[in-house]
Amino acid sequence: MPVDDTLIAFASRLADTSGAVIRPLFRQRIDVAHKQGRHDFDPVTEADKGAERAIRDLLRRERPDDAILGEEYGAQAGTSGYRWILDPVDGTRAFITGRHEWGSLIALEKDGAPVLGLLDQPVLGERFIGVNGAAHLIQAGRSQKLEVRACASLSEAVLCATDPRAYFTNEQVAAVDRVARGVKMTRYGGD
């Protein structure tokens, strides 16, 4: 289902709203709490919670019939068939250590099918949007279409991912390692 320009612009407004909350907190002394019952250490900060609250407030005002699923505050039902999925600070460990490997994730579903994905890196001024079968990097007001590199074989591939040792079982790590041995280059990082 094609997504119209109004929804694309609104998703960008949600990212702007999130970034306005998060940017002043990056590389500042902020409290870090632990979300109980998730992982050994699953940090959450006021940046995570404040940004999600700000996004939810904007959604309630302008799209009150849409459902919401957020990392920090869970699910809110809707009646429009649209559902916004939010993780305002994906990579909280990187965020609290002052590294740039984090971003705000905003996705939109229509009747259970994904129709838009947005990654905003507000301190770097980079925004990635995937919608209507295309992906773009928006930076300094300019849009650049993104495409995957041509890759005829696994030995030409570059594998970039979160460090599998952070979340995977030993069996899953071994599977990733088998793939990694066959690629041209591997880069792990972030959380």
Task: Give the ranges of each region predicted by the language model.
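Flexible, active-site-adjacent loop/turn segments at secondary-structure boundaries
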Residues: 28-30, 42, 93-94, 100, ...
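Acidic beta-strand-loop-alpha-helix segment within the catalytic core
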Residues: 107-191
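Conserved protein kinase catalytic core
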Residues: 77, 93-96, 127
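Glycine-centered loop/turn positions within well-structured domains
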Residues: 20, 66, 102, 125-126, ...
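Short, well-ordered turn and helix-capping elements at secondary-structure junctions
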Residues: 72-74, 89-92, 163, 183
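N-terminal subdomain of lithium-sensitive/metallo-dependent phosphomonoesterases centered on the IMPase/IPPase/PAP
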Residues: 1-89, 174
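Glycine-rich active-site/cofactor-binding loop and its immediate structural neighborhood
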Residues: 82-122
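Residue-level signal for inorganic ion chemistry
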Residues: 22, 48, 59, 92, ...
